[in-house]
Amino acid sequence: MTAARKQVENSSDGHGAAIKGKRGRNRIGAGRRRMILAPLMATSVLSASIVLAQADTGGAFATDPADWPEKEAGIPVTDALTVEKCGTCHAPDDKGNLSRISWIRATPEGWAQAIKRMVKLNGLSITPEEARSVTRYLGTWHGLAPEEAKPVMYIPERRILDETIIPNETLHNGCAACHAFGQPMSSRRSRREWGLLQNMHKALYTQAAVQIERDAEDQPGTIKPPMKKLTRGEVALDWLTQNAGLHTKAWAEWRPRIRTPRLAGTWLVSGTMRGHGRFVGEMTIAPDGDDFTTTTTLRSLDTGKVLTRSGKGLVYGGYSWRGSSKSGTAPARPDDLAATARETVWIAPDQSRGEGRWYWGEYHEFGLDVTMTRVTGAPVLAAVSPLGVKTGSKATEVHIYGASLPTGLAAGDLDFGSGVTVRKVSVLSPSEAVATIDVADDAPVGQHDVALGGVVLARALPVYAGIDYMKVTPETALAHLGGIKYGKGYEQFEAIGWSKGLDGKQGTDDDFPIMPVDATFAMKEFQTVTYDNDTRFIGKLDPSGFFTPNVEGPNPERRFSRNNYGEVWVVATAKSLKNKEGQPMTAQAYLVTTVPAYKRWDQPEVSE
């Protein structure tokens, strides 16, 4: 396998082992997604601070972290139910701190996993309703600041992606070899708590002990022969203490700003889903005690089909939305937007906008990427269509979707950037207008902003001279066999046309995506094992790029009766686009189809 995928929903939580509770599903599979990353930081970032940290903890790694004195101030626990349910084992002190708990901050999912573990390992007696209340308190007052949570929102959004936040090879091999690095970065802890977390990993996972005790790949320059090399655990502890400590500037600034979420009203929603295109619509949020109910209407910009959903949601920490919604119509396909979905949205601290994912599927593989903007009566912009315009084009009609668009909108009120002239504007409704534009031959290529007065829709309209090449997304993908005992894990591929940008060179930073390309899809053998014929056994790829995996279990038709796992190239061939040789433009992605995930960690209760 030349590349790999990180399956964030199959990762253990930042507190260690995840334990199955009454309402959670926990599986971990041999097909957990991996990725091979180059080191992202030079070894120079690790310095003598590690040695100093060792001295500060009395030899640190020569002693048990459980014996280290806790030198940092804790965060007092002020919720009566949390004290009642947790305080028996987690002894309180005279400052209102509960042992362990007061020296950890985490996401709602992290606290939910910790509660499940206490039930399973320590016999905690707690009802589902009480657990939700404790999770809400801890996820708010012992949670993350918005700017701490945003870089790792892909964890609660259940996105499957290649992580870019791993700082060096040591932490890649010591932490992210088994779970997403976003898991530890979804919590903040004192140095002692990071040490105790390593202890728990070594106690519960045999392989973790081996990984943590190996020599670190990134050794500080202060370590010279014959000095003993630092272990991965030592380097990781120092890095996490410095970069994910309990007390941070972000938390100190956010803690006094936490307030009751006031989200009631109308929100403009725009979204995209691979293989399904773009959607615009409105969500109406109404208060329901401490929670909310929602009614959402979405319209496809490709087909015009309208979908209505209703649901509920709650907010942790004043900014972190968790919800669920359904359409009331039975889904016709696994990827049908009518399916019941869970919702994770990061809401801006000023509660004016949000961004996140509504997702479903056995592996959460289907999802709508959404942005939300509060409707206040002032103009709001959500999307434009078509997705791109070509240089030199004349009298092109561009539909603008938003809210509270002025009825007297004039050509001079709109700005599409340099080289684009607005000839006229027609307002069809407060939520849609049509602008007729000309694009100059020498208009700068790139993603242009669309502006209406002081309202800007950033990078909304690609201006391009031509589609220079294609990419298939996702570029690396993982599907799961299933259909007999376990559910299938599907995958949807899409071909996207790209521009080389201003420099005319492919693969540089100024390249930009333009729009989906009409293409057909087929599988091609990925040559790793002779005569394995993976294209025959792993599943079916339809011409639209939707992959359905085969069933799990031994297959007597395969050599050695192997399972139907395998790896292939997914090749997209454009129906009309040609390359410079006059041949149909092509691109390919890498697909691994593996066995079911037999154990999985999930916290659906945080959305209830």
Language-model region placement:
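Electrostatic cytochrome c docking/interface patches
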Residues: 54-82, 122-123, 130, 145-169, ...
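Gly/Gly-Pro-rich "capping" loops immediately C-terminal to redox-active cysteine motifs
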Residues: 91-121, 180-206, 308-310, 314-315
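C-terminal capping alpha-helices of c-type cytochrome domains
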Residues: 123-153, 207, 212-258
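Central antiparallel beta-sheet cores of small beta-barrel/beta-sandwich binding domains
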Residues: 179-180, 257, 261-350, 355-358
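Edge beta-strand at a domain terminus
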Residues: 249, 340-342, 346-383, 587-597
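Beta-strand/beta-sandwich contexts
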Residues: 373-413, 455-508, 604-605
